[in-house]
């Protein structure tokens, strides 16, 4: 009976001591995993930031192209209203007050010289 008790006690002591070692190993593993997770999150965050910056650069580039294409024409054609203080009539045209048929518009138009 004593041998059974001694054997049981020996097995119990080994189990407890190995269990503590496993507990320490588990704690170390968990720390490593959380550190790896943090580094992965940092990597993912940096990657997302780079993609957003590229997207922003493309959008700004498209805006600048759009503004270049949508600029106003350089001159105004014949029969088109113009501003007497800032005439933008094309060459060969003059910004004049309309005669007869356009009197009621109270505006200036580009006419041939």
From Swiss-Prot:
Main location as per UniProt: secreted
Signal sequence bounds: 1-21
Cystines in this chain: 75-90, 82-95, 89-110
One MF term in the entry's GO annotations: sodium channel inhibitor activity
Alphabetic keyword roster: Disulfide bond, Ion channel impairing toxin, Knottin, Secreted, Signal, Toxin
Subcellular location per the Swiss-Prot or TrEMBL entry: Secreted
Function: Probable ion channel inhibitor.
Protein's name according to its UniProt entry: U11-theraphotoxin-Hhn1a
Organism: Cyriopagopus hainanus
